Amino acid sequence: SKLPPIKIGKNGTLQEWYEDYEEVEPGHRHMSHLYALYPSNQITQATPELFKAAEKTIERRLTYGGAGQTGWSRAWIINFFARLQKGEEGLEHIHEMMATQLSPNMFDLLGEIFQIEGNFGATAGIAEMLVQSHEEGIIRLLPALPEAWNTGKVKGLKARGNFEISMEWEAGKLKKAEILSISGGKTKVVCQGKEWEINLEKGASQVLL
């Protein structure tokens, strides 16, 4: 690849351009320089300087109003906060989207125009708040769980490696999880300071308590 490496600029944020230009519109709704955080995986907790710079980039964008112009840009913010493991902030933008950008039938609208990417992006963000698997060989459960969701359950969430996750949690703590391997394979499951090494045959499952 001939793409230049990700750089941190003078503001402590990720550079949007090859040169560290002064931003003309610091609150713009497009945030393609954060692609490495979401939906890709070049920026994770394993790259702490970039992880911190990504968070600062988002904070700066939001300070100048970048997020609320469209449903899809709001959905992008939800996913960013999920990847940063900031559940309260993610939930705040879910609520903002529901209050200001959805029609009564839950379609994401820009004026009278239906923009389905807002709906797809927001639901993807909710899933990311509950299960993440973008890091090689790791599945994280409840990585960005907000206080308002402190008790609940989900079934059938998919993870990389062709795993399927069903789980219950109570008072903010994992109660039970079942990991089903559709194809067979290994992975590590991480949740709230605990780790499990999983090695399953095709069609087999393992319950974590």
Predicted regions located by residue number:
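Active-site core of glycosidic bond-cleaving carbohydrate-active enzymes
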Residues: 1-134, 138
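Non-catalytic C-terminal accessory modules of carbohydrate-active enzymes
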Residues: 88-209
